[in-house]
Amino acid sequence: MATFLSEDFLLGNEFARRLYHDYAADQPIFDYHCHLPPEQIAENTRFKNLYEIWLKGDHYKWRAMRTNGVAERLCTGDAGDREKFDAWAATVPHTIGNPLYHWTHLELRRPFGITGTLLSPTTADDIWQRGNALLAQDDFRARGIMQQMNVKMVGTTDDPIDDLRHHKAIAADSSFDIKVLPSWRPDKAFNIDAPGFNDYLQKLEAAADINIGRFSALCDALKKRMDHFAAHGCKVADHALDVVVYGEADESTLDAILTARLSGKLPTPEQSAQFKSAVLLFLAAEYQRREWVQQYHIGALRNNNSRMLASVGPDIGFDSINDRPLAEALSRLLDAQARQGGLPKTILYCLNPRDNEVIGTMVGNFQGEGTPGKMQFGSGWWFNDQKDGMQRQMTQLAQLGLLSRFVGMLTDSRSFLSYTRHEYFRRILCQMIGGWVENGEAPADITLLGEMVKNICFDNAKNYFAIELA
């Protein structure tokens, strides 16, 4: 019987253990997509307690707590920090089988060094006290944790109207050598059917100092803001395509759609598809020109619980997996980008694992131009960010493409404690490849496979995003 969370956690054979300990474990972290608040890095935030760094803003934990019968005031409400932590501690023993159980104890082990103690109501006070004592030390401020975890680069998620002053401050600080770069997230500029679209355009007008009355003016405003992002080192764009649509329209039609929307008239589904497609085509051409990477996160069904949305807002754990078809519209969108000469490096993520093979084969349609792995099938995302989901994604990527060219893991997280997800991913990767060797499905060539693992853990991403590191 294996020991829980030992040094060989998830590594079921000797070859897997060699791959992990000799090639994967010590690789730096290139976290190219996350939701860390850049101001906390700029200010080198000192977190006052475990709740603040660990539970606050974590919708994964809130979903589990609600399922365990925890009242909302102990999740997102007005309860005290210790009360909320105790509610989480009481939930953790019930999460066995959920990745939260693994993540929780990996995060206690690194960076806190808390091992051999499982979080529960019995141990909550001890862990609370030990964790808080460490958080009072400089090594456990925001930057210290990043340095402890051997992070080399993080890409935050930022709106086109953001002034990026925190990124500027970080870049100007010669005492901190981790790259913290903005990522361009222009969803609000193309979601023309969203309730706040008109209000957002006013903010974009102010940020770009351009009056947006026509489609060309919207493009000019976005281009000006991209210049601002580029000046702060941006090399990556990210887009939430909850539903993939495609439509074609000339500029006069796009002007009419925009004018009608600005006057308060909602677009038809066809008009919405035309407008979104036109903006994404324009953006893709700009990304190609600027040598940016574009990411599409596909298939979330958001804000399902309207009562809770009205009560506590979005992004608090009431989203799930959509099952809308995506293949044809995605094919037409990517093909249109390629035809205009503007298909940049692209990473596609799907939330519905049913779509893995769709994405795995779609990226193969647009590879080439001398760039290894130009089109990427992105790592298991959100509800697939767990052992089974990662194995499925990597297995299907290997079967339909080249696993060796995969850019690997990202945290997609709001927490400074989530870097152990890279460790989790690396253990799963090494176990999968070690299993192939064990079954005679891959050669027992430690140099060949070790280099492959090393590349997937760090080097592929470093080369793909072409970001100069310290």
Curated annotation (Swiss-Prot):
It holds the Pfam family UxaC. SUPFAM superfamilies: Metallo-dependent hydrolases. GO terms for molecular function: glucuronate isomerase activity. Its EC number is 5.3.1.12. It catalyses: D-glucuronate = D-fructuronate; aldehydo-D-galacturonate = keto-D-tagaturonate. It is an enzyme of class 5 (isomerase). One of its GO terms (biological process) is D-galacturonate catabolic process. Pathway: Carbohydrate metabolism; pentose and glucuronate interconversion. Keywords: Isomerase. Belongs to the metallo-dependent hydrolases superfamily. Uronate isomerase family. NCBIfam families: PRK02925.1 (NF002794). HAMAP family: UxaC. This is Uronate isomerase. The lineage of its organism: Bacteria, Pseudomonadati, Pseudomonadota, Gammaproteobacteria, Enterobacterales.
